[in-house]
Amino acid sequence: MIEKLYGKNINFLIGSGASFGVIPTLSSNYINDKNEKLSIEEILVEKGNDDDLQNIIYLWYYHEILKVGYLKELKEDNLVFKNYQKLLENLIKLLQRENYQKEKRINIFTTNYDLFFEKAADSLVGKYEFYFNDDSSGNITKKLSMKNYHKKIYHTGIFDNFDREIPIINLFKLHGSVSWKYVNYKNDKPYEIKIEYYEDKDTKYIENLIEEISNEEIDIAKEIIENNESLKENIKNTKKELFKDFVLIFPEKNKFENTLYQEFYYQNLRQLSYELEKQNSILIVFGFSFADEHIAEIVKRACNNPTLNIYIFCYSLNTENEILNNLKLEEFPNNIKTILPEDNGNIDFNIFLKKLFEINLKIESDNNE
């Protein structure tokens, strides 16, 4: 479908399914009293008064999602990493082929905390001429500011005898990043966010107590805590410390420990809304189920734009119904197209790339064609 992208305002919405294989998703094997399987977010909401359970899950969350998200031990031949590389490479090539009348810019919105996009972009420096914009500015200390997204960069040559626009990939991390840290406190409140690409060596979190989120594992861990006062004390403030240390939206509905990030979150959402309201916009969705109610509402509202086209790549045949439910729709509007797997298979990252950059992929006619 690559031919559908030229000349358009291109936006991506990438969720946890893209990093699966290295970073776990928020699904779990936990069953509640009604015999319902819950996601991690649903467990934390339903068991909001169980402090031990909350701390056990947040400790697991730190070790399995946040700590792994730095990708310190990632090898360059890792398949997930190579898929991120291929995505960025193909997008850079697409922008290089755009005509001079079209801005050479693509926006990637992601709810993932990990550093896959950053590391993939870094690996392409020197191979391609492009600018990867993660919203930061600075040299020794890199700080975030929304105004950093509104840039155009040109190559002029030694004698300034021509202007050639450099392709820009904008990365919007809607739920924060493991690399973001609060700085410059005033009256015990931070007012800036900086980027640190490495985990603090003096981490204070104890070893993980469970291997997976399941009733059996959590019950065993809770019993261990009950019989060990020292361990109980060590784990007591896990959730509180994580909220303080990481600039993230954690897997609980409507949870903002810090108003600075709440403001930053809504600024990012407004940017998503603004991009989808532009003429001839495209939104390509992969690995995302629309469980975030704010994002779901923005995308639904954006469907009123008659020139917007949304392509949702569904991991499995069941994913289509899950997304319909999360969007609170009975059927998709005309400008949402779902791309389903063939032969009861799955659309993983590799197949997504093949379908996305395949010429003449059969999809229903676009709204504005």
For each predicted feature, which ranges?
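Compositionally biased, low-complexity linear motifs
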Residues: 29-38, 125-133, 192-195, 279-282, ...
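Alpha-helix boundary/N-cap detector
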Residues: 48, 52, 75-82, 108, ...
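Extended, H/D-rich, highly charged conserved domains that either
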Residues: 21, 100-250
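Active-site-proximal helix-loop elements at catalytic-domain edges
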Residues: 69-76, 239-257
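Gly/serine-rich nucleotide phosphate-binding loop at the start of the catalytic core
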Residues: 1-135, 181
